[in-house]
């Protein structure tokens, strides 16, 4: 990362803005949120959704996916050049659920992409409002992070499934820009780089010619993004090596896996933002809330306040537990998939249980599932306290973590010891220590080994009462350290499949 002077807050990345003061940032983020809300209201009108149907999270997701698809330039171009049978490149759609005679029914809708782009631009003062689209992508990414595990993807790139806490944002599309890069975990970017290097090993022309030059620029840019996430000089120096390599190959892959592992203890900076489903913003706009005038922040109290008084419903499969479905969506709303469960439980005011103990599958419903057998219930998305979202990743304390996930990536800026099993992490570092990065590796391992509990617990602000909007009276919770800290412990979550 360049000097502090050029660092932009993520609200600025979010809105594509240059340096702004806090009020301007709040206003431009508010403008973006208001645009999403207005778009949602208009789509509900066009689709003739009742108030209840418009509050159904499954309908919200379908509408969100339609607008993302309508603006996916590269895919649209590809579809037009490679027509496939039965797919109209100019149309997009999905399942809309309607309540008919006391039963839920699924209706597959098709819409002109051009029409959706028109509605979106109209809701956003005639602009393309890319920031709003990215915001929706991050909400979908956070939902995926809470719902699925990425074991297969980790194993395929040579990483260890226990490193799942580094995989935030692993399903974000490439076009998600700076705001998307800010929320990606160290493992996610390492994995993208490893995939590039593997393609280069298998395809001699990958780095050659005009295309290869562009590829190289993308490679170096991604290296710089990853470098900017590390907080120690040795980790950054190692990233310089990876970036400057003439012909990236297995040595670089090794280095990247090493660096990703080191991030379990020497954590990277990963931003967290509360991105809510479009229907929540729609409800607020419909009730007269002026986001641009009031201002909005993705990392402060605002999303908590919004969720305190929004009623959102979800379809529930016959054997699912509605409380567990609520937990899943709550975690997604606050980007808390890799947060310590004790911290999440304290803030939420309800026990947050590990993924393996949840009796619920994902929020989205497959086309072959029988909707008539399903009921809908209110999602409980309220919280007892609020806390500022972190972007630092903090550092760690030697606490027991679990077999399934051996570290956490803090979401909330709350002081605590971090659960994590030093022995398990350090065991991964025996073996290969020669080659051009050996001195950096030695230095990194030394830092990891000497990490002392007291200087390394996460120094956060604490949590706040919901009435304490200016964050004046921090409450520092005390946690029972014998409790389970990780969400993906002993896990049986489904794999994420594109």
Swiss-Prot record:
The record's Gene Ontology cellular component field reads:
helical viral capsid; host cell; host cell nucleus; ribonucleoprotein complex; viral nucleocapsid
Q: Name one Pfam family in it.
A: Flu_NP
Residue ranges with Basic and acidic residues bias: 8-22
The short sequence motif called Unconventional nuclear localization signal sits at: 1-18
Q: Sorted alphabetically, which InterPro entries does this protein's record hold?
A: Flu_NP (IPR002141)
Name the predominant localization. Answer: virion
Question: Where found, per UniProt?
Answer: Virion; Host nucleus
Domain of life the protein comes from: Viruses
Task: Report the HAMAP family cross-referenced here.
Answer: INFV_NCAP
Q: What does this protein do?
A: Encapsidates the negative strand viral RNA, protecting it from nucleases. The encapsidated genomic RNA is termed the ribonucleoprotein (RNP) and serves as template for transcription and replication. The RNP needs to be localized in the host nucleus to start an infectious cycle, but is too large to diffuse through the nuclear pore complex. NP comprises at least 2 nuclear localization signals that are responsible for the active RNP import into the nucleus through cellular importin alpha/beta pathway.
Name of this chain's protein: Nucleoprotein
What gene name is given for the protein in this entry? NP
């Amino acid at each position: 990362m360049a000097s502090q002077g050029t660092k932009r807050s993520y609200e600025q990345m979010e809105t594509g803005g240059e340096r702004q003061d806090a009020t301007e940032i709040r206003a431009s983020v508010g403008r973006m949120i208001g645009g999403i809300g207005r778009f949602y209201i208009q789509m509900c009108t066009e689709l003739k959704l009742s108030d209840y149907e418009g509050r159904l999270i499954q309908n919200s997701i379908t509408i969100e996916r339609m607008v993302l698809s309508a603006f996916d330039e590269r895919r649209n171009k590809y579809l037009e050049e490679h027509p496939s049978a039965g797919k109209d490149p100019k149309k997009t759609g999905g399942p809309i659920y309607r309540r008919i005679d006391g039963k839920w029914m699924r209706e597959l809708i098709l819409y002109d992409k051009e029409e959706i782009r028109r509605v979106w631009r109209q809701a956003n003062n005639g602009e393309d409002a890319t920031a709003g689209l990215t915001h929706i992508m991050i909400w979908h990414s956070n939902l995926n992070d809470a719902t699925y595990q990425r074991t297969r993807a980790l194993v395929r790139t040579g990483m260890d499934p226990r490193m799942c806490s580094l995989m935030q944002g692993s399903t974000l599309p490439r076009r998600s820009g700076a705001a998307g890069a800010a929320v990606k975990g160290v493992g996610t970017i390492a994995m993208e780089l490893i995939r590039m290097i593997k393609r280069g090993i298998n395809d001699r022309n990958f780095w050659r010619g005009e295309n290869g030059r562009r590829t190289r620029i993308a490679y170096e840019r991604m290296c710089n993004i990853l470098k900017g996430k590390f907080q120690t000089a040795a980790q950054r120096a190692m990233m310089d090596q990876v970036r400057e390599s003439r012909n990236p190959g297995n040595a670089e892959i090794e280095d990247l896996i090493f660096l990703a592992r080191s991030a379990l203890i020497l954590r990277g900076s990963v931003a967290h933002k509360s991105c809510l489903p479009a229907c929540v913003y729609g409800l607020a706009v419909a009730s007269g809330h002026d986001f641009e005038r009031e201002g909005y922040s993705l990392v402060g109290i605002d999303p908590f306040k919004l969720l305190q008084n929004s009623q959102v419903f979800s379809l529930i499969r016959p054997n699912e537990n509605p409380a567990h479905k609520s937990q899943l969506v709550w975690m997604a709303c606050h980007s808390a998939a890799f947060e310590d469960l004790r911290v999440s439980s304290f803030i939420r005011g309800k026990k947050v249980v590990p993924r393996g103990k949840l009796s619920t599958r994902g929020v989205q419903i497959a086309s072959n599932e029988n909707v008539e057998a399903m009921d809908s219930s209110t999602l409980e998305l309220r919280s007892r306290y609020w806390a500022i979202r972190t972007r630092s990743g903090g550092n760690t304390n030697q606490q027991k973590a679990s077999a399934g996930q051996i570290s956490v990536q803090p979401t909330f800026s709350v002081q605590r010891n971090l659960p994590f099993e030093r022995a398990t992490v350090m065991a991964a570092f025996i073996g290969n220590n020669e080659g051009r990065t050996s001195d950096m590796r030695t230095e990194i391992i030394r830092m990891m080994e000497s990490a002392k509990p007291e200087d390394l617990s996460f120094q956060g602000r604490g949590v706040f009462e919901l009435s304490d909007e200016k964050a004046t009276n921090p409450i520092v919770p005390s946690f029972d350290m014998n409790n389970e800290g990780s969400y993906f412990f002993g896990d049986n979550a489904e794999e994420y499949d594109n």
